């Protein structure tokens, strides 16, 4: 019983600490989803993205990044304008955010596979997002409302289970 309560406490502590991480770069790892890395992903289930990329406005990319030449400066700039507000979600490689976003970018833009992965390269950490490009806290809270309510539900269930274990 004590082992179970310690494990639950450790799980709660990890979930709280993981919510404090933030980034101002779009990691190069997000481009792996565009490169169709199948072998490693077959056995790994990814959590659902808290951002609904389905109904986003992709004209910021499709109006600037046009074929047949797909100019890198315009394409990468437009990609960063679109993606930088979601760096935290896109850099979470345990979620399907990057895969989902690239699916819709390619659906609406009809881009060749790997276009952004091959053209958009900056530093060791990935694409640098300009200061202030991340979502402000109130907008971020709206985007992540599903995650927040889900996290609260799990915390409540975990706490209830912990109390139940302690009582019996």
Curated annotation (Swiss-Prot):
InterPro entries: LORELEI-like. Keywords: Cell membrane, Glycoprotein, GPI-anchor, Lipoprotein, Membrane, Signal. Residues 145-168 form a propeptide. Expressed in pollen, pollen tubes, sporophytic pistil tissues, in the early stages of female gametophyte development, and in unfertilized, mature ovules. Expressed in roots, lateral roots, shoots, cotyledons, petioles, developing leaves and anther filaments. Disruption phenotype: Retarded growth, collapsed root hairs, defective trichomes, abnormal accumulation of high levels of anthocyanin and overall reduced plant size. No aborted seed phenotype and normal production of seed sets. GO terms for cellular component: plasma membrane; plastid; pollen tube; side of membrane. A lipid is attached at residue 144 (GPI-anchor amidated asparagine). It is found in: Cell membrane. One of its GO terms (biological process) is positive regulation of growth. The keyword Signal applies. It comes from the Eukaryota. Residues 1-23 form the signal peptide. Glycans are attached at residue 57. It is a lipid-anchor; GPI-anchor. Interacts with FER. PANTHER family: GPI-ANCHORED PROTEIN LLG1 (PTHR31533:SF2), GPI-ANCHORED PROTEIN LLG1-RELATED-RELATED (PTHR31533). This is GPI-anchored protein LLG1. The gene is LLG1.
